[in-house]
């Protein structure tokens, strides 16, 4: 508050907020040899100079030190707009991610109502991998595809449930390429166990341009070229877990952020920032039912986890059977998730584009690691849209440990 000068004895009025934040010191200048007051009971009218002095004891606390209100929520939409304002992402990416979050909300509702709406059980068809499609697999794929098409910002979409990538109609077409598994762990639906959706976002490949006069076969080939990019090219990746809470995990290359769906407002709210995977952990997540089919080196690794070791305690086994659920626990608690190759699945079971690359990108952004047992997953150049690879992902020390066993003579 600037110094103020008055020439009358009129009182100086302050608002309650100003009065609480400051006190007034008034200095009355006197001429040499004169008294402050002239005569008895009669005040002179000297110039009065008043200055506000900040009372540090009663001043409000700085914003950083102020306790955050329980109603001061940062929604996914608000967070995305902030990233756009700061130049981290562009407007098109904001719209694509918002469309994906909308699809996840719809799928979450379908999953919760599946037994009521008779959406459990199989559809009666198989997907391109020869797997029986659940009813919710088909519906979730349609929901995801429609949300991405109507966003007007995607050029090519590739789903685990579709034979080939699909070019979005020109009237709705955009630039981004989105790969996704609409409902991971759908075999758990009938038992109401955690499921999830996984996605990754790429820019178009420089080698691929679809001309206006391209034939259907040419468009398909160009779509495949566009989609078959290494995970190191990912611009964003994430997953949504449908469990006791609906959790949306996202990275745009600046760390991992966790949003939780608030059923009261129907919005994803930021609940964790810059998540970091512990450097090591004492939890392993493998389907040990396939132990007899594993390589001897992998068997030795698994046996080592069950020995007391230096800590005096063996590792704990935790396996849900849903990649999203098992990975989310691994990310928070540390440890390792693995789905290796075996005699039955020579190249592993998980898809590189839709599952392994996005999860490995998230893991690395959280300070972890993703490997196929011999090399970084994000460095693998896809040779087919539905290519499968082994996956070991989680804490850096745990992934490096299994790599040492697999590379031993």
Curated annotation (Swiss-Prot):
Gene3D superfamilies named in the record: 3.40.190.80, Fructose-1,6-Bisphosphatase, subunit A, domain 1 (3.30.540.10)
Which PROSITE patterns would you find in this protein's record? FBPASE
GO molecular function ontology, one term from the record: fructose 1,6-bisphosphate 1-phosphatase activity
Quote the tissue specificity entry: In photosynthetically active tissues, and in the shoot and root apical meristems.
CDD domains tied to this protein: FBPase
The chemistry this enzyme catalyses reads: beta-D-fructose 1,6-bisphosphate + H2O = beta-D-fructose 6-phosphate + phosphate
Q: What induces it?
A: Light activation through pH changes, Mg(2+) levels and also by light-modulated reduction of essential disulfide groups via the ferredoxin-thioredoxin f system.
Q: One matching Pfam family, short form? A: FBPase
tRNA-binding found in the keyword field = no
Which terms are listed as keywords in the entry?
Calvin cycle, Carbohydrate metabolism, Chloroplast, Disulfide bond, Hydrolase, Magnesium, Metal-binding, Plastid, Transit peptide
- What GO CC annotations are associated with the protein? chloroplast; cytoplasm; cytosol
Identify the residues that bind substrate: 184-187, 287, 319, 337, 339, 349
**Alphabetized HAMAP family for the sequence:** FBPase_class1
- Under which name does UniProt file this protein? Fructose-1,6-bisphosphatase, chloroplastic
User: Organism source for this protein?
Assistant: Triticum aestivum (Wheat)
């Amino acid at each position: 508050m600037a110094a103020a000068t008055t020439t009358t004895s009129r009182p100086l009025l302050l608002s309650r907020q100003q009065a609480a934040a400051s006190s007034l010191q008034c200095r009355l200048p006197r001429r040499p040899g004169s008294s402050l007051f002239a005569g008895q009971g009669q005040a002179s009218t000297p110039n009065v100079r008043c200055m506000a002095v900040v009372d540090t004891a009663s001043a409000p606390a700085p914003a950083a030190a102020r306790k955050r209100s329980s109603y001061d929520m940062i929604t996914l939409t608000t967070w995305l707009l902030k990233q756009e304002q700061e130049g981290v992402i562009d407007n098109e990416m904001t719209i694509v991610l918002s469309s994906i979050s909308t699809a996840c909300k719809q799928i979450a509702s379908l999953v919760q109502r599946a037994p009521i709406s008779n959406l459990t059980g199989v559809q009666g068809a198989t997907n391109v991998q020869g797997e029986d499609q659940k009813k919710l697999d088909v519906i979730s794929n349609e929901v995801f595809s429609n949300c991405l098409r109507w966003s007007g910002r995607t050029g090519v979409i590739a789903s685990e449930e579709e034979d080939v990538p699909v070019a979005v109609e020109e009237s709705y077409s955009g630039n981004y390429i989105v790969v996704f598994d609409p409902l991971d762990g759908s075999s758990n639906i009938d038992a109401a166990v955690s499921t999830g959706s996984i996605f990754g976002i790429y820019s178009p490949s420089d080698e691929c341009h679809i001309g206006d006069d391209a034939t259907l076969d040419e468009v398909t080939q160009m779509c495949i070229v566009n989609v078959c990019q290494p995970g190191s090219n990912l611009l964003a990746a994430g997953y949504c877990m449908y469990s006791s809470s609906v959790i949306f995990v996202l990275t745009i290359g600046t760390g991992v952020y966790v949003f939780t769906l608030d059923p009261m407002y129907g919005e994803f709210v930021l609940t964790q920032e810059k998540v970091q995977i512990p450097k090591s952990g004492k939890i392993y997540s493998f389907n040990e039912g396939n132990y007899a089919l594993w390589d001897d080196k992998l068997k030795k690794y698994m046996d080592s986890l069950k020995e007391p070791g230096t800590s005096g305690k063996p590792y704990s086994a935790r396996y849900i059977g849903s990649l999203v659920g098992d990975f989310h626990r691994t990310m928070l608690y540390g440890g390792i998730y693995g789905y290796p190759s075996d005699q039955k699945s020579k190249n592993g079971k998980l898809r590189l584009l839709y599952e392994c690359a996005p999860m490995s990108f998230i893991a690395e952004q959280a300070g972890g690691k993703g490997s196929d047992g011999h090399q970084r997953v994000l460095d693998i150049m896809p040779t087919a849209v539905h290519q499968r690879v082994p996956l070991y992902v989680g804490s850096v020390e745990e992934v490096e440990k299994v790599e040492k066993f697999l590379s031993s003579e």
